[in-house]
Amino acid sequence: MSVLTSLPEWKNLSDIAASVKSAHMRDWFAQDTSRADKMQLEACGIFLDYSKNRVNEDALKGLFDLARACKLETLRDAMFSGEQINSTEGRAVLHTALRNFSDRKVLVDGEDVMPEVHATLEKIEAFTASIHSGEHKGYTGKPIKHIVAIGIGGSFLGPKIMTEALKPHTVDAVKVHFVANVDGCHIHDVLSSIDFEETLVVMSSKSFSTQETLQNTLTAKDWFLKSGGTQEDIAKHFVAVSSNVKAATDFGISADNIFPMWDWVGGRYSLWSAIGLPISLALGFENFKGLLEGAFEMDNHFTTAPLEENMPVLLGLLGIWYRNFFDAQSHVLLPYYHYLRGLPAYVQQLDMESNGKEVTQEGESVDYPTGPIIWGSEGTNGQHSFHQLIHQGSGVIPADFMLPLNVPNQDDTHHAMLASNCFGQTQALMQGKSFEECYADLDGKGLDDAERKRLAAHKTMPGNKPSNTFLFDSLTPQTLGALVAMYEHKVFVQGVIWNLNSFDQWGVELGKVLGNQVLAGIQGEADKDNFDASTQQLIAKFRAANAPK
C-alpha cells in the first residue's frame, strides 16, 4: 500500500464515495434549493457552476483535507519560489515568472530571472511593431505579409490554439500559418500558397535540433533558396526561438533575431515565453500581453485564495474524486464557442504529458490510477456524435462545459441556441430521464406492455453524470490567459496529490530517440538486428516501396 492510499484522509474519502454512489444529484437539487448558489465560484472573470457534481459537503471537506495532508500549499509555494521541483531533471518550474507583473524577484540558482524576462518581452514587442509597421522588410524591399510558424508540441499547440481562440483580435498586416507535423504535405501546402519575398519563418526549438521542426525549417530554407533568395538573405526572412544560438547563426539567422528559451520553462508551458512570438505577430503585442495578464491574475488567485474558494484546487480535487473513487478513465472538454474548439487538444497535451506517469517522485510504482484521457470537441457538434457515450455509456465521464455570454459578430438567435444547447446538456446529464417517464411516453403508441418496457429501457437516461460549467462575459485575451492558467494549476494540483513529477516527459523523449534510430534503419545506416522482427518487417516494406524504380 502506497503512502497516499494509506492516508486516513484517503480511506475517509473511500467511505464517503461508497455512500455518494447510491445518491442521485436530482434528489440533492430537490432537497436543497440553494445547492446551485452554494456551489459556485468566480475568479478572474470566470464563473464556475460546480453544483452538477456528485459531491456533497462531506465529500468536499474530505477532498480539501486530502489536499492539506498532501502538503499542496507547501508544494505550490515551492513551485512559485523557484525550487527545483522537477526532480528528475534538476530544474525549477517557473513558467509563472513569464507572466509576473509584480515587483517580486524570481530567483533561479540565486539569480533574478525577471530582468531577462522583461527584456525578452520588450524584444517581442519591438519585433512585432517592426513587422506590422513594415519597417522590417524582406530582402527585395517588400513588407512581410506571411508568417510561417514552425514548431511541435508545446511550441506549436499553444501559439496556434491561442491565435485561433482570439481570431476576432487578428491584425490585418500579416497572416500566420502554423506547421508542426513532419508529414511533408502540410509544409508544402503552406509554402505553395505564399510569396517567398513576403514571408518570415519563425523556427521554435530550444535545441534547434528537434527532428520535425528542423526538417520543416530546412524544407522552408530550400524553398526560399530555390525561389531566388540567397544564404545572405536568410537573415531577413528567418528568426528563431532557441537557446542554441550557435546552431541558429550557423543556419543563417541573425543573432539579433534569436529569442531566448530557458530550461526552467517546459514546452507545454511555453506559450507565455518567446514561443508566443507568433501570437504577438498574429494578434498584436498588447493582446499577447493581455494573455499574460490574465494568467498572472489566475496565478494570484491560485496562490492566495483559501483552498475551499480556489478554482484550480477545486477542479483538481474533483478530478481526483472521479479518477480514483469513481474509476473515471477520461475527462471531456466541451467549449461551446467555435473559436475555442482547439482548447481540448491543448489541455490534452498539458494534462496527459504532465500526469501520464506510473511512478511516484520516489520512483515507486503507484497503486492507484493517475492521469485520465483528455478529449473533447466544440459544441454543439459533439451532441450529434460522442455525447451519446457520455449520456448512456456504462462509465463516468466528467465534463467541462464552457460558454462566452457575449460573442462578436453574431446575431442573437445563433448565440441563444448555442447557450440553450449548452445548458440543456448539463441538465440532461445531471437529471436524466427515468424508466418510468420513458414508459409513460410510450402510452397510446399501440405497443403491448412487453414492448413498451423494452423500448423504455433503451430510452432511459440514467443521469447523475457530473459536469462543470464555465461562463465568461466574452473571450478576451485576459480571460483566455486565466482559463489556460487555471487548467495548468489544476494539473499541478492533481500531480501533487498523486505524488508525481508533472514536469518531465520521459515517454516523449524515448519516442524521439527511437524515431531517430528507425530513421537510420530506413536510410540503410543501421544494422537491422538493432530492431525487433516486427519493426524490421515494417522498415523492409517501406524501403521496398521507396526503392529507386
UniProtKB/Swiss-Prot annotation:
Keyword field contains Cytoplasm: yes
Gene Ontology biological process: gluconeogenesis; glucose 6-phosphate metabolic process; glycolytic process
Metabolic or biological pathway, per its Swiss-Prot or TrEMBL entry: Carbohydrate biosynthesis; gluconeogenesis; Carbohydrate degradation; glycolysis; D-glyceraldehyde 3-phosphate and glycerone phosphate from D-glucose: step 2/4
CC annotations in GO: cytosol
Record PROSITE patterns: P_GLUCOSE_ISOMERASE_1 (PS00765), P_GLUCOSE_ISOMERASE_2 (PS00174), P_GLUCOSE_ISOMERASE_3 (PS51463)
Active-site residues, as the UniProt record annotates them: E353 (proton donor), H384, K512
Annotated InterPro entries: G6P_Isomerase (IPR001672), G6P_Isomerase_C (IPR023096), Phosphoglucose_isomerase_CS (IPR018189), SIS_dom_sf (IPR046348), SIS_PGI_1 (IPR035476), SIS_PGI_2 (IPR035482)
Keywords assigned: Cytoplasm, Gluconeogenesis, Glycolysis, Isomerase
Family: Belongs to the GPI family.
Task performed by this protein: Catalyzes the reversible isomerization of glucose-6-phosphate to fructose-6-phosphate.
Annotated protein name in UniProt: Glucose-6-phosphate isomerase
Species whose genome carries this gene: Alteromonas mediterranea (strain DSM 17117 / CIP 110805 / LMG 28347 / Deep ecotype)
Gene: pgi
